[in-house]
Amino acid sequence: MRFFPILCLVLFISHGVASRRHSHSKKKKAKESSVGAVGPPSSKDFAFRLYRALVSESPGQNVFFSPLSVSMSLGMLSLGAGLKTKTQILDGLGLSLQQGQEDKLHKGFQQLLQRFRQPSDGLQLSLGSALFKDPAVHIRDDFLSAMKTLYMSDTFSTNFGNPEIAKKQINNYVAKQTKGKIVDFIKDLDSTHVMIVVNYIFFKAKWQTAFSETNTHKMDFHVTPKRTTQVPMMNREDGYSYYLDQNISCTVVGIPYQGNAIALFILPSEGKMKQVEDGLDERTLRNWLKMFTKRRLDLYLPKFSIEATYKLENVLPKLGIQDVFTTHADLSGITDHTNIKLSEMVHKSMMEVEESGTTAAAITGAIFTFRSARPSSLKIEFTRPFLLTLMEDSHILFVGKVTRP
């Protein structure tokens, strides 16, 4: 049996350098993003169902992943899947083959890739894929054509008979696409591999208004009610998008980036993490974005870096995507070889959140001013485990849980 894995790479870097070049309309648009703009029609609930599956696999650990990258990888795989396997993939994404949503899925990703390739001031966002295949294995021309046309995928001839050379070629590609942040991603490779599909998303953004390094101090973070650890805590008093969700017991704070992106930080009430996680769905997200109001907050947010790697072949079956990782999978649309099997689907993600330098913060100042006496601010401290989601326009790029900053 010959094998091929799918590798999903995610890199998120948030820098707090501020800028005044963006208009109020762009800030307002980021705040008021609706769930449903042009793009792939995969259910937003897929992001949260996958989140809950990953949490169950890693209890008490940090969680960070890109539902966009995972769904795009599954979309590419569905191009070459037979009816039963394809139906499982689409059902897992919350779509229906009978309703003609497969074409909308592929065309949606095509539109998204085209839009993400357009330069955006203050925001670096790249999404793409590549296929590395052994020249001895014939891949169907219509599959390669669809990968190129719909997913703008690069295709490389790779000598898997020499694992060291193949590993170096793929790792060099990964390092280039992630701007050197992910190196030596593939550590083990052998001659049974005949094809590797890589999907990556790279995000680097600046806050619209910076945190000042002089306001960052060590504070206690309560990992559990009985365990605390010291973490660098950023602080900025300013106007933020704010909503208190009493239905599922959490506080939501929206912090805009340049380039029409926004990060939502979700702080469950004490002892209510499970209740909040169970309540995460598309309707909840839409309600938060709709109900946001501007509120002056004295915000404390950890400066943190997290990294996660997942073997999705252990997780996706919980979402109903089962056959694709077994010998029952029908991948005849990819190759005529009957002894080729999808061996694994690895998702690696990294996230760094930090404040800007003092100079940048001093140049920027606050983006909200008040004519009358300065109103009192509400103090919100992210000093216990919290959730986050990052959106660009209506698209959920990342979802995470910070348990140990």
UniProtKB/Swiss-Prot annotation:
Reported consequences of knocking out the gene:
Mice are healthy but males are infertile; spermatozoa are morphologically abnormal, most lacked tails and malformed heads. The lumina of the seminiferous tubules are filled with cells in different stages of spermatogenesis and are sometimes necrotic. The cytoplasm of Sertoli cells contained vacuoles and appeared necrotic. The Sertoli cell barrier appeared disrupted.
Q: Which GO terms describe its biological process?
A: spermatogenesis
One example of the protein's molecular function in GO is: phosphatidylcholine binding
Top-level taxon of origin: Eukaryota
Glycosylation site residues:
N247
Q: Which residues form the signal peptide?
A: 1-19
Q: Does the keyword Phosphoprotein apply?
A: no
Changes after translation: N-glycosylated; glycans consist of a mixture of sialylated bi- (including sialyl-Lewis X epitopes), tri- and tetra-antennary complex-type chains; affects the maximal heparin- and thrombomodulin-enhanced rates of thrombin inhibition. O-glycosylated; further modified with 2 sialic acid residues. Proteolytically cleaved at the N-terminus; inhibits slightly the heparin- and thrombomodulin-enhanced rates of thrombin inhibition.
Q: In which tissues is it expressed?
A: Not detected in blood plasma (at protein level). Expressed in testis, epididymis, seminal vesicles, prostate and ovaries.
Q: Tell me, what controls this protein's activity? A: Its inhibitory activity is greatly enhanced in the presence of glycosaminoglycans, heparin, thrombomodulin and phospholipids vesicles.
A single Gene Ontology CC term: protein C inhibitor-PLAT complex
Coiled-coil ranges per UniProt: none
Mostly located where? secreted
CDD domains the record matches: serpinA5_PCI
**Site (Reactive bond) residue list:** S372, A373
Pro-peptide positions?
Answer: 20-24
Keyword Glycoprotein attached:
yes
Q: Which InterPro entries match?
A: Serpin_dom, Serpin_fam, Serpin_sf, Serpin_sf_1, Serpin_sf_2
Q: How does it assemble?
A: Forms protease inhibiting heterodimers in extracellular body fluids with serine proteases such as activated protein C/coagulation factor V/F5, acrosin/ACR, chymotrypsinogen B/CTRB1, prothrombin/F2, factor Xa/F10, factor XI/F11, kallikrein/KLKB1, tissue kallikrein, trypsin/PRSS1, prostate specific antigen/KLK3, tissue plasminogen activator/PLAT and urinary plasminogen activator/PLAU. Forms membrane-anchored serine proteases inhibiting heterodimers with TMPRSS7 and TMPRSS11E. Interacts with SEMG2.
Q: What does this protein do?
A: Heparin-dependent serine protease inhibitor acting in body fluids and secretions. Inactivates serine proteases by binding irreversibly to their serine activation site. Involved in the regulation of intravascular and extravascular proteolytic activities. Plays hemostatic roles in the blood plasma. Acts as a procoagulant and pro-inflammatory factor by inhibiting the anticoagulant activated protein C factor as well as the generation of activated protein C factor by the thrombin/thrombomodulin complex.
User: Domain text from the record?
Assistant: The reactive center loop (RCL) extends out from the body of the protein and directs binding to the target protease. The protease cleaves the serpin at the reactive site within the RCL, establishing a covalent linkage between the carboxyl group of the serpin reactive site and the serine hydroxyl of the protease. The resulting inactive serpin-protease complex is highly stable.
State what protein this is by name. Plasma serine protease inhibitor
